[in-house]
Amino acid sequence: MWTIYQHHKGMHYLTLGKALHSESMESQAVYIALYDNPHNSMWVRPSSMFFDNGGPRGGKRFSPLAVVRKLALNESERILGFGYDAWGDGRTQSQFVESYKTNINHLRGQRYVLETTDGGILSTVNTLRLTADTVGLAWLATHPEHRKQGHATILMHAVMALLRHENPDMTFVLHSEIGVRYFERFGFEKASVEHQHFEKSVAMVAANDSEPPSLDGLLKEFF
């Protein structure tokens, strides 16, 4: 579980935990900026500066905004209804939710959620480990009552940052059903024509390397 903080000027930061200074033993906050950070650099600052009241008029410099965590499979019914209006395909909502009990991508994926600090789920995204260095992102959805508030964007930035913290060479792929513009903000580009296999979606890739690795048919299957 990771907490996202909002700076008093509006920027978002993902905390990775705390560390101790090797000489003074002073507590340090370890975090990643979720903006203007193409190399996914980690930063540290004394915890006293992170959690103090150094903001305007004595307010908090950083305030807890939301929590990112992995979703357990047995919690799935809490989020599956989020996608019903987009992917229901004429089924009842109960039929739609029931279908995921045998959906291979749902069962093999690791979902992440963005929650309020009191546990209300706002957005979710599924991650599929396709190779050691490639993750497919799918099923990005927000609770209908909380849409158009930037929650999915925060979750995408956070999940990509966490996975690149694990592996700096991580490449991400996805199939966009909403065009390319939204996902370009996360560094995605339209994949070359040989990777475009589905009429109603656009295959996209985001790689840290200037030369993305071979996708080797990874985008032939819709996920």
Q: Which positions does each model-derived feature cover?
A:
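Mixed-charge, low-complexity intrinsically disordered regions
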Residues: 1-67
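A structural microfeature
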Residues: 17, 122-123, 192
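Short amphipathic alpha-helix that is part of the acyltransferase structural core
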Residues: 66-99, 106-115, 120-121, 208-223
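Conserved beta-strand in the GNAT
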Residues: 113, 119-129, 133-141
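A short, internal acetyl-CoA/4′-phosphopantetheine-binding micro-motif in the GNAT/acyltransferase core
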Residues: 140-148, 178
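Conserved acetyl-CoA pyrophosphate-binding loop and the N-cap/start of the following alpha-helix
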Residues: 146-158
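Conserved active-site alpha-helix within GNAT-family acetyltransferase domains
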Residues: 168-170, 177-200
